[in-house]
Amino acid sequence: LAKRHIKLYLMLVPDKERVYSEYYPDGYTKVNEQAKIEQVYEFVGKYTDIPVVYPIKALEKAKKNHLLFYKTGTHWNHRGAYVAYLEMMKMLKKDYPELRVLKESDFNIAPQFSADEDISNALGLDAKSTFPKEDMTYDVFELKKPTTTVVHEFVNKKLKIETFDYVSSNPANKLKAIFYADSQFLRMSWYVAESFKKMQHIYVGYGRDFDIPYMAEDIEAFAPDILVVETGERFLNRLMKLEMPEQQ
């Protein structure tokens, strides 16, 4: 990637039970003192030159004052995503200090009745009619002055490859970025794009492996300055199959 002037970064997203481990039922004990995600974080930091962010400490601090994950799903809510966004942007700004970081004052933030229902659906529960309204009410972030437009495209329906292409009208934005990221990134992608001239989110959903070699020509044509690979903790194993274009 360096030959193509693309800077690679890694973002590791802890699972909800990692952040809220105090809610494990009595009788459950740790199998290993160090979790796999912690091992990956330490290994990448020690043996590679890839900058990596693992926002566990920021999330643990923020949970004292805010609910960060949906009770009925596996994803963080808007508040949790924003906490992680700040940590990610802190990492990127070390190399690109000109990047704009959105403040809470850039958003209208209000509690709304909303839900992420992947867990409740798996259990056959209608979350909105089963749980109290207060358990389904979370801070929702809306940008006051968005500058981006987005186009959603299915690149390959069979392989479930889809992209979200953002373009900003803000002339101060000069950099281009690609985020190879799963559904956790969907809670922040629309405002992460506010920091870039162009940003593409290549969606790695449905638990599938990274397919960077398949998208290599598209990535090269996009010519990003920044490539961020993000994965949730439960899909860590797919990092073992992560291949960069020049390896093909």
Question: What does each of the following model-derived ranges do?
Answer:
Residues 1-248:
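Extracellular glycan-modifying ectodomains
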